[in-house]
Amino acid sequence: MSRLHNYGLFQLIFAVSLGAWLTGCATATVATSDIGVLDPQLPIIPLATPFPIRTIETLDKKTNKRIETDVLAMKSSEIRKRLTTYESFTTIQKRDTSGGLTYIGNSAKIGKGTYIITFDYVNSTVQEISFNGRAKPALGQIGVGLRITAEVTTLTNDVEIGGLIPLGIAFNDRKVNGNLRFKAFGLSNDKVASLIPVDKQVLDVSGIQKAFEAAATVRLLIGLDETTLEPHLIGVTGVSVSESQSALDAAKSKLSKSP
């Protein structure tokens, strides 16, 4: 497929395919000043793979207190009412020469290298997670949605890769190459397998468009009565990178226990 030469066309694809998701949706970003900080606090530290949880907080109407309820005992309509926030999270990690990954901020242009970019489009809520005797708990981000993972190699310096549109523009300008992977999580519907790409997609105009279409599709499927929902732990917020693994472990332990 030929490369696009018009930013306006990317905007059109974005508006048509993903507008339904992002209307009223909060997007998590990182300030430029966080770039290069040894231990930044990012909007979210995602799990490598979203993890199915066993319990979710609900309100006991008899006692007017929050209790842990087994998600399998809840109807999908009840779960849907708990996942009240539509959000998109973007996190970027840089791969070093030894294969290790380091989190960086996502609102500034970056230099040559290989990067893993995680885009989470989710219906979600949060639950407090206590860990390591910390006075202020972390927040476990739980929900259902779509994860798009881009593995990108930048071919020049000063490339913006903190979003699907910037990635498409960078591809158009021959500044990046790479691939995209898709994972719908926390929802069961016969249409998922046929509408969400299973195979790795090349990072090109077609791949970017499929990403938008997949996000819009999942957003619609979440709202359908016939879709079964099972919330997953997506990641943790309110912690620094150095604390994140302890917080993630505590979240997995708490949310996988029987109520």
Q: Model-derived features: where do they sit?
A:
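Membrane pore-forming effector domains from diverse proteins
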Residues: A28-Q93, K109-P259
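Compositionally biased, intrinsically disordered low-complexity regions enriched in proline and serine
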Residues: N6-G8, L22, E213, L233
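Short flexible linkers and secondary-structure junctions
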Residues: T97-K109
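Bacterial N-terminal signal peptides that target proteins for export
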Residues: S2-I13
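Generic detector of short, well-ordered, non-transmembrane alpha-helical segments enriched
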Residues: W21, I104-N106, I165
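Bacterial N-terminal signal peptides
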Residues: Q11-W21
